[in-house]
């Protein structure tokens, strides 16, 4: 599923607004120990973002790359902009930036993905954030994760993923180190026990 499909969807699918939590046996290194927020799911496939993978780039790096600031300017950015989190959202279009954010900010290009969360993938939100404005809660993700028609359903059926309702606090939490464990804990599952059980399956 692509961003254009997300824009044109008419109804929400079964996995919309769900977390996917990778099982210990996940063989794809792109998704090992990941938590993914599913933004859209339909008969055409699914699209979402990894929310617990750091990115080496900073928001200042992004602004420099987009020529929004000059090399000598980063220090004048508002503190909120300098601290703005950048994460790896997935292996598809990994050079493209997407901003998941609270619904207090909206532009003509913003796409609602839940009652409280929107997705914007245009420069207007980057400019707003660089000025210390923009949404109260947000994170930028480079790339996204995508599944073809029926692919995600098959992976879940084959025990590749656990699923649970998404938690907005976890989506925007900047502490990435233990998000995987906390997502599992939210389901009442101990990550260490899950790994041990998978190893003896």
From Swiss-Prot:
InterPro entries: AlgH-like. Gene3D superfamilies: VC0467-like. This is UPF0301 protein RHE_CH00966. GO terms for cellular component: cytosol. Belongs to the UPF0301 (AlgH) family. It comes from Rhizobium etli (strain ATCC 51251 / DSM 11541 / JCM 21823 / NBRC 15573 / CFN 42).
């Amino acid at each position: 599923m692509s961003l254009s499909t997300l824009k044109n969807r008419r109804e929400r699918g079964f996995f919309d607004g769900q977390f996917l939590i990778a099982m210990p046996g996940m063989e794809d290194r792109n998704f090992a120990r990941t938590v993914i927020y599913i933004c859209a799911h339909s008969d055409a496939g699914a699209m979402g973002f990894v929310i617990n993978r750091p990115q080496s780039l900073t928001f200042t790096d992004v602004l420099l790359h987009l020529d929004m600031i000059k090399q000598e300017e980063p220090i004048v950015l508002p503190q909120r902009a300098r601290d703005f989190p950048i994460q790896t959202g997935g292996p598809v279009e990994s050079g493209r930036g997407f901003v998941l954010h609270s619904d207090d900010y909206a532009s003509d290009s913003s796409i609602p993905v839940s009652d409280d969360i929107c997705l914007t993938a245009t420069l207007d939100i980057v400019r707003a954030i660089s000025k210390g404005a923009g949404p109260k809660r947000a994170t930028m993700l480079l790339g996204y994760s995508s599944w073809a028609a029926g692919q995600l359903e098959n992976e879940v059926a084959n025990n590749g993923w656990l699923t649970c309702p998404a938690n907005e606090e976890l989506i925007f939490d900047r502490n990435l180190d233990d998000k995987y464990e906390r997502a599992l804990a939210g389901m009442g599952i101990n990550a260490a026990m899950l790994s041990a059980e998978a190893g003896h399956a």
